[in-house]
Amino acid sequence: MEDMTVEVRGSNGAFYKGFVKDVHEDSLTVVFENNWQPERQVPFDEVRMPPLPDIKKEITEGDEVEVYSRANDQEPCGWWLAKVRMMKGEFYVIEYAACDATYNEIVTFERLRPVNQNKTVTKNSFFKCTVDVPEDLRESCSNENVHKEFKKAVGACRVYFHAETNQLIILSACESTVKRVNILSDMHLRSIRTKLMLMSRNEEATKHLECTKQLASAFHEEFIVREDLMGLAIGTHGSNIQQARKVPGITAIELDEDSGTFRIYGESAEAVKKARSYLEFVEDFIQVPRNLVGKVIGKNGKVIQEIVDKSGVVRVRIEGDNETKLPREDGMVPFVFVGTKENIGNVQVLLEYHIAYLKEVEQLRMERLQIDEQLRQIGMGFRPSSSRGTEKEKGYATDESTASSVRGSRSYSGRGRGRRGPNYTSGYGTNSELSNPSETESERKEELSDWSLAGEDERESRQQRDSRRRPGGRGRSGSAGRGRGGSRGGKSSISSVLKDPDSNPYSLLDNTESDQTADTDASESHHNTNRRRRSRRRRTDEDSSLMDGMTESDNASVNENGLDDSEQKPQRRNRSRRRRFRGQAEDRQPVTVADYISRAESQSRQRNLPKETLAKGKKEKVKDVIEEHGPSEKVINGPRASSADKASNPQTASTERNQASCQDGSKQEAIMNGVS
């Protein structure tokens, strides 16, 4: 403000020092030194510029000078006009010209100066410029020290901010200042803004330094977050940091972005830990068994998505087999989770529980499979279907152990049409004494081995025929049904004729056609039958049994027609095949009434035989039974064939036996048990 110093003439004629604050059309706003007078506007003709400071002081006696003095103690000093009367050394005797009465005073050389030759100021003595200040810079522009460099650059006398007009005022005594202001005003405002920002940062740094000094003795924690997780820790627009700062008791949170270090300061350890839980993001992995990966993920990722939602983790990733970043155990697949430490702990609990649950379910499933396997193995013991092929290959050589194992604990004695009870008397006159336990056991062996060796289709057709011939149900000893131990209707069977020779033999011819029709129809229905019921098929009267074969011919196996009985009725193993071709055999050998009459006479002769003959016949019958179940089979009146040959080609063997029996019966007469 010294550059705008002026001298204002007072009422007493002295000039007092003042400062120009503003320039008007015809006056100046002047502020006096030390404010001994209030600020006021002074006309141009009462204001002059001070003399230059480098003027040489050459004062001699009689020169007019100006003395820096005051009239009284209440007024400040001013320049008064005077005249030098005498000088002695450094002291001068002056006489004031302003006063009417002469007033002399002795002064030193420092209080004297030559008379100021400057005239009063005019309108063109000062130049004024104004610059509009933005709102954000008004506060900073109020400080005159901010414009120090600008003032020096433009050559202004004074630069200050006017609060009423919000303008920056530049005052100068040079006209060139106006041009410079127009050039530098924008740059000056921009520099003010930059300096303001820097100053604000410095102030924050100063405050932070003070806070750091205060918090040095308080609670604080420091942790590092990985660079790739820094974005998650900061959050969207710094949401996580703001949330952590809102925790009660948190005083400051610092972040070093270069190293990824967070520093949290708080009033208590609990507040610091809570704020840390919001900011500390980590990555961790959990090993999952490979066989449970699919179940952990779930269909369309439903299970793993539920785990992620409940735990709060940010993301999950399954480590591939080709990736080797994480340590991997044998048979395990790493699941990588990203989130806060609390979220990682939650997902670990959920995943471990789910894996334990899956293992328990798998263990229960394996136990169920073991139980099912044991049940399947136990069930196979009652089903000899798996050994069916081997039994077919064995033929008639099935031993007693095999038969008993197939038969199991089930007893077949006394059941079925072909089974004879202990009190059964054959129609051929054989009483119960002839059927001993050995014969019954042999009969069981033969039936089981023959039945297991028969084909599936033969069993079904045989079962169908049996079911077709049971119109009366399964009552016990019923006359019209198939009861246990009962016959199949005595009027239509050969056994009924043999039992009662005196009856009408022509009644059999009436029922032959219906019997054949029943056999034919039975093969076309009832295909779905039970395996066990098939294995216990009841023997029909047409099926020859061991006991029937022994009692029908006590003397020999040759009937009255000259045919070998053992070859006319081959082994029961080929029973189904024999029935299949029975129509052809019946065409070759039709049944006549004479056959039944001759058979009845033979039966009557057998009843009249002596006891010795019967005993001899009994021994021969036992011998035949042993030969039939032995390794080699001996045919008395027919061609010899092994069991394997019969099993391999039963159809051919049956046909050959029928032909051979016809030839042998016509050429020679066999003798057995002494009876021709």
UniProtKB/Swiss-Prot annotation:
Biased composition (Gly residues): 474-489
Location (main, coarse): cytoplasm
Compositional bias segments (type: Low complexity): 404-414
Basic residues biased stretches: 528-538, 571-582
Region listing for CC2 domain, in residue ranges: 353-379
Residues covered by the Agenet-like domain: 4-50, 63-115
Basic and acidic residues: bias regions: 609-632
Pfam families reported in the protein's UniProt record: Agenet, FXMRP1_C_core, FXR_C1, FXR_C3, KH_1, KH_9, Tudor_FRX1
InterPro entries (UniProt xref): Agenet-like_dom, FMR1, FMR1-like_C_core, FMRP_KH0, FXR1_C1, FXR_C3, KH_dom, KH_dom_type_1
Key words, A-Z: Cytoplasm, Developmental protein, Differentiation, Myogenesis, Repeat, RNA-binding
A GO molecular-function annotation: protein heterodimerization activity
Start and end residues of each stretch annotated as CC1 domain: 201-208
GO cellular component: cytoplasm; cytoplasmic stress granule; intracellular membraneless organelle; neuron projection; nucleus; presynapse
Biological process according to GO: animal organ development; dentate gyrus development; membraneless organelle assembly; midbrain development; mRNA destabilization; mRNA transport; muscle organ development; muscle structure development
Domain KH: residue ranges: 222-251, 285-314
Localization annotation: Cytoplasm, Cytoplasmic ribonucleoprotein granule; Cytoplasm, Stress granule; Cytoplasm
Compositional bias ranges of the Acidic residues kind: 512-522
Superkingdom classification of source: Eukaryota
Chain segments carrying region Disordered: 380-676
Main function: mRNA-binding protein that acts as a regulator of mRNAs translation and/or stability, and which is required for various processes, such as neurogenesis and muscle development. Specifically binds to AU-rich elements (AREs) in the 3'-UTR of target mRNAs. Promotes formation of some phase-separated membraneless compartment by undergoing liquid-liquid phase separation upon binding to AREs-containing mRNAs, leading to assemble mRNAs into cytoplasmic ribonucleoprotein granules that concentrate mRNAs with associated regulatory factors.
Free-text comment on this protein's domains from its UniProt entry: Disordered region at the C-terminus undergoes liquid-liquid phase separation (LLPS) for the formation of a membraneless compartment that stores mRNAs.
Family: Belongs to the FMR1 family.
Protein name, per record: RNA-binding protein fxr1-A
Organism annotation: Xenopus laevis (African clawed frog)
